[in-house]
Swiss-Prot record:
Sequence positions bearing N6-(pyridoxal phosphate)lysine: K91
Listed name of the protein: Tryptophan synthase beta chain
Family: Belongs to the TrpB family.
Recorded metabolic or biological pathway in which this protein acts: Amino-acid biosynthesis; L-tryptophan biosynthesis; L-tryptophan from chorismate: step 5/5
């Protein structure tokens, strides 16, 4: 592989790095050492692969969406079915790996942040599996939006802490989880949920999620005899996208498209389009594109989908954009809801609202491509968690 990042200081070009208090520096360095060692440890890799296959249910299918393709009227659309994983999303690819890493480091407790609740559920799941004590921080707004996932986490034995500070969403949950980690660093591992945070987290999460792209690349070659012409994924922090993109990074013929949440529209204040509208800053221990005002205060991100409303983006995505290796687009709430319904009706698949952003852009892109071309879209999660929210929204529209 010719592309190599991060450098030894955890930078992807000018993005990334390690901006943490002294109290955490020892912990992130210890984590980095343990992680690098685990990569060449056959016993660790064997155990990881065992749980991915037998517990998570990998590999996931690469499904030819025939009716969706016909609807778009262009390139063949293949769906990488991460919604079929145990717990219903891509998040568990990463939590399994990090829980095994925590165990290797002798840490019996884990802490995590969650927005939509998917990462919280995936963390609580592996904590139950490996008999670890688990604390999850979740913004008060998200606790309301995703009450079912809160109950799921509690069923799995986790303690869910509702965060009432700031905008009471994902950003604030990360702040509190980091504070908790600082106070309990000796016996606790922080399971970061996306390609964010101080080095080595973006690298660790990318590598554990790369199973998505590794499988998709192999499966597409088997089905089509060539690589896809384009790959598409939604981007909040950006872990499902990075998991799909990274194994294709040296395949210059494969266009990579990340899709952010445009909320009510980029011209409004209600969006989460960090790459389109952000400026470079430091958030949660790394240099990244951040939504901020002229005084450098972090703005609230907004999206119908709780998993996309993060005001930053993984540093490697910003690096890909600067290199011209990936293009980033945005899709509004209304477009995502339309795509959600479209996939339900054409393929009988209920996607997560996060993934619906990718579907929306993919259909537009496919329609401009030739029938002999093909694309892979990451269906990052299933939509059970969103059905209630959607029901209220659609009923609200019919009652207006």
């Amino acid at each position: 592989m010719t592309y190599q990042a991060p450098d030894e200081n955890g930078f992807y070009g000018k993005f990334g790095g390690r901006f943490v208090p002294e109290t955490l520096m020892k912990a992130v360095k210890e984590l980095d050492e343990a992680y690098q060692a685990s990569k060449t440890d056959p016993a660790f890799q064997k155990e990881l692969n065992y749980y991915l296959k037998e517990y998570v249910g990998r590999e996931t299918p690469l499904y030819f969406a025939e009716q969706l393709t016909a609807h778009a009227g262009g390139a063949k659309i293949y769906l990488k079915r991460e919604d079929l994983n145990h717990t219903g999303a891509h998040k568990i690819n990463n939590t399994i790996g990090q829980a095994l890493l925590a165990r290797q480091m002798g840490k019996q407790k884990v802490v995590a942040e969650t927005g939509a609740g998917q990462h919280g559920v995936a963390t609580a799941t592996v904590a139950a599996l490996f008999n670890m004590k688990c604390t999850i921080f979740m913004g008060e707004e998200d606790v309301k939006r995703q009450s079912l996932n809160v109950f799921r986490m509690e069923l799995l034995g986790a303690k869910v802490v509702s965060v009432k500070a700031g905008s009471r969403t994902l950003k604030d949950a990360v702040n509190e989880a980091l504070r908790f980690w600082v106070a309990n660093v000796e016996d606790t591992h922080y399971i970061m949920g996306s390609v964010l945070g101080p080095h080595p987290f973006p690298e660790i999460v990318r590598d554990y999620q790369s199973v998505i792209g590794i499988e998709a690349r192999k499966q597409h070659l088997e089905k089509e005899g060539k690589l896809p012409d384009a790959i598409v994924a939604c981007v909040g922090g950006g872990s499902n996208a990075m998991g799909l993109f990274y194994p294709f990074v040296d395949d210059a013929s494969v266009q990579m498209h990340g899709v952010e949440a445009a909320g009510h529209g980029l011209e409004t204040e209600f969006h989460a389009a960090t790459i389109s509208k952000g400026e470079i800053g430091i958030l949660h221990g790394a240099m990244m594109d951040v939504l901020q005002d002229e005084n450098g205060q972090i703005l609230e991100a907004f999206s119908i989908s709780a998993g996309l409303d993060y005001p930053g983006i993984g540093p490697e995505h910003s690096f890909f954009r600067d290199l011209g290796r990936a293009a980033y687009h945005s899709v509004t709430d209304d477009e995502a809801v339309e795509a959600f319904q479209l996939l339900c009706r054409t393929e009988g698949i209920i996607p997560a609202l996060e993934s619906s952003h990718a579907i929306s852009y993919a259909v537009k892109l496919a329609s401009k491509m030739r029938p002999e071309e093909s694309m892979v879209v990451c269906l990052s999660g299933r939509g059970d968690k969103d059905v209630n929210q959607l029901k209220e929204r659609l009923e609200g529209q019919t009652n207006d």
